[in-house]
A protein has these predicted regions:
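Internal alpha-helical scaffold of NAD(P)-dependent oxidoreductase catalytic cores
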Residues: 11, 32-130
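Short amphipathic alpha-helical segments and helix-helix/interface helices
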Residues: 5-6, 59, 120, 182
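Conserved beta-strand termini and adjacent loop/short-helix elements that scaffold enzyme active sites
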Residues: 17-19, 72-74, 133
Length: 192
């Protein structure tokens, strides 16, 4: 999970985290926004799942800064679930004939919804807790409803800022995450 990082930085020095922010550089100026907390607050947690003093201090800093945050008990599961969702979203942009209009392609949104549900199902079968709770909701939603939600998200200002811009400007990163995620699912399924 985080062994390599601990070998590099030292045991007990890592707090796995994920920022609740998105954006991109436009003409050398960073245009970034905090994601709505209902979508994704800045999330962090201890590797062992506990609540340490340093974790509570970090939470206090975010609270005083008015930055939405959430302490997550199992960051490894959280990050896997995040990948289960964002990898197919990025893939949809790359498959679209006109990436900025991906949300208008009903069949592509249906395929994306099916892939997200399949990814979450694979994680669930591997014993990964679906977290945060919205991942359990996505896992249970009918494909038709999820694909409609994706169409709205892809065509929204939110989708442009937090999904499209990152997917298009971080192509190498997203391809690497694609390969790592599906490699992880495949290798874990082979072991079981």
């Amino acid at each position: 999970k985080y062994n390599t990082w601990e070998e590099i930085c030292g045991k007990g020095r890592i707090i796995p985290a994920f920022p609740g922010v998105g954006g991109s550089f436009e003409e050398n100026i960073l245009d970034a926004k905090l994601t709505p907390s209902i979508i994704q607050a800045t999330t962090f947690g201890e590797i062992n799942g506990g609540k340490s003093e340093r974790l509570l201090q970090l939470a206090s800093i975010f609270k005083r800064s008015y930055i939405p945050y959430k302490i997550e008990k199992d960051m490894h599961a959280w990050q896997l679930c995040h990948l289960a969702m964002i990898v197919p979203i990025a893939d949809a942009y790359y498959e679209a004939g006109v990436p900025e209009k991906a949300g208008e392609d009903r069949e592509l949104m249906r395929k994306t919804a099916i892939t997200i549900k399949k990814n979450l199902d694979s994680l669930h079968k591997l014993g990964v807790t679906l977290t945060p709770k919205k991942m359990k909701v996505l896992h249970r939603l009918p494909v038709q409803i999820l694909s409609i939600g994706l169409r709205f998200a892809f065509q929204s200002e939110f989708g442009n800022t937090f999904m499209y811009q990152h997917s298009m400007k971080a192509l190498d990163e997203m391809r690497a995450l694609h390969n790592q995620f599906y490699g992880y699912i495949g290798s874990e399924e082979d072991r079981n």
